[in-house]
């Protein structure tokens, strides 16, 4: 399904890797970003693991740490860290997202062009 506009910039699609299980502790998603697309600022109570399955992307946090990622890379985002992730301007990116501890907490603000450009 297409991701909601209020939490993303650009075209993003996502879907579960497995059917939801009542009271499941693990949330698994496949997320596909079009070139330049990205999440808004958000955090996960118990952190997040991203595995890049295809393309090139960026993962950054509020303190200015930023890493460019490519297919085969894994990124571990610490619990509670406010961050964003998405595709580079010239490539699609698909990652697998693994989280526990409940839903994503959106910060209510999108990543501006200056933060996106680094």
Task: Describe the predicted segments one by one.
Residues 13-16, 27-44, 79:
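Conserved short histidine dyad/triad with adjacent acidic residue
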């Amino acid at each position: 399904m297409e991701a909601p506009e209020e939490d993303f910039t650009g075209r993003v699609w996502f879907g579960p890797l497995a059917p939801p299980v009542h009271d499941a502790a693990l949330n698994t998603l496949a997320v596909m970003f079009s070139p330049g697309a990205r999440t808004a600022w958000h955090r996960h109570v118990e952190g997040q693991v991203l595995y890049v399955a295809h393309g090139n992307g960026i993962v950054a946090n509020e303190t200015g740490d930023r890493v460019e990622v490519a297919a085969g890379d894994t990124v571990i985002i610490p619990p509670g860290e406010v961050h964003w992730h998405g595709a580079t301007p010239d490539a699609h990116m698909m990652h697998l997202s693994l989280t526990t501890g409940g839903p994503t907490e959106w910060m209510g603000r999108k990543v501006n062009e200056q933060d996106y450009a680094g």
